[in-house]
């Protein structure tokens, strides 16, 4: 099923539908737009017909210099059976030749009052967001001190309980159990909850609770960029866990690598506080402050000083 259709951008940007109403359900498959300036001159060899076509003052002013026959030919070739739509910006008058051709091919022709560059930018951002590669991950996404923390782990390890404690401590829930992740840009992953379970949290023994109703609108978010992955696992006495934090583990989601921390779970450990400190420490590292490296440097200096004293 197509993620975006022409009718979606008509509603989103409040576009005026001028003609070609039969084609408003055409799918939009790419976020790239086309400004068919060279096509107005008659060169259609590399015409990207599958894109939204955006006509501004430049294209239409050149179009007006053409003869009537040329105008008809250009618009006939501009309107194809795979063109999702043609948008006229700045509220400019729509050429009658375009209306005729669009009605024949059922290509929606829309008009916007926005300036061409602004419309192009907003439309591209919207389509990139909607058409971004997506995946779904089993886990909980929480906004902790402005850091999007994805908490993963096996069922029953305590992900939802940790999220509940974090919300009680003033942080915000984004998604529980299933996190839908979109790669909106290179290195940018944005997580959100499926519409069916938005703002809901499941606690074993309590059932499903509505976090917005219980804690207010300030306790939830609709989406958040993911910066850190924390994997909860049951404590294994035979496994060596990182005690210094010098080595940074990575996990790949879609085409993006994220920092991953593995936190062992055992009775008596306050996971919510650990997640809070992990988020703050992650922010410090991004600001250039690394406690593990500072300790390592101090230790090296102490060893070297000791060797000099021994000599």
From Swiss-Prot:
CDD domains recorded: HprK_C
Binding site for Mg(2+): 160, 202
Family matches, as Pfam families: Hpr_kinase_C, Hpr_kinase_N
Necessary cofactors: Mg(2+)
Record keywords: ATP-binding, Carbohydrate metabolism, Kinase, Magnesium, Metal-binding, Multifunctional enzyme, Nucleotide-binding, Serine/threonine-protein kinase, Transferase
Region (Important for the catalytic mechanism of both phosphorylation and dephosphorylation): 201-210
Span list, region Important for the catalytic mechanism of dephosphorylation: 264-269
Gene3D superfamilies documented for this protein: HprK N-terminal domain-like, P-loop containing nucleotide triphosphate hydrolases
Record GO biological process: regulation of carbohydrate metabolic process
Molecular function GO labels: ATP binding; magnesium ion binding; phosphorelay sensor kinase activity; protein serine/threonine kinase activity; protein serine/threonine/tyrosine kinase activity
Catalytic activity reported: [HPr protein]-L-serine + ATP = [HPr protein]-O-phospho-L-serine + ADP + H(+); [HPr protein]-O-phospho-L-serine + phosphate + H(+) = [HPr protein]-L-serine + diphosphate
Active site annotation, chain numbering: 138, 159, 177 (proton acceptor), 243
InterPro entries the record matches: HPr(Ser)_kin/Pase, Hpr_kin/Pase_C, Hpr_kin/Pase_Hpr_N, P-loop_NTPase, Ser_kin/Pase_Hpr-like_N_sf
Function: Catalyzes the ATP- as well as the pyrophosphate-dependent phosphorylation of a specific serine residue in HPr, a phosphocarrier protein of the phosphoenolpyruvate-dependent sugar phosphotransferase system (PTS). HprK/P also catalyzes the pyrophosphate-producing, inorganic phosphate-dependent dephosphorylation (phosphorolysis) of seryl-phosphorylated HPr (P-Ser-HPr).
Complexes and interactors: Homohexamer.
Remaining remarks: Both phosphorylation and phosphorolysis are carried out by the same active site and suggest a common mechanism for both reactions.
Comment block on domains: The Walker A ATP-binding motif also binds Pi and PPi.
Family designation: Belongs to the HPrK/P family.
PANTHER family: HPR KINASE_PHOSPHORYLASE, PROTEIN YJDM-RELATED
Protein name: HPr kinase/phosphorylase
Organism in which the protein naturally occurs: Geobacillus sp. (strain WCH70)
Lineage: Bacteria, Bacillati, Bacillota, Bacilli, Bacillales
Gene from which this protein is expressed: hprK
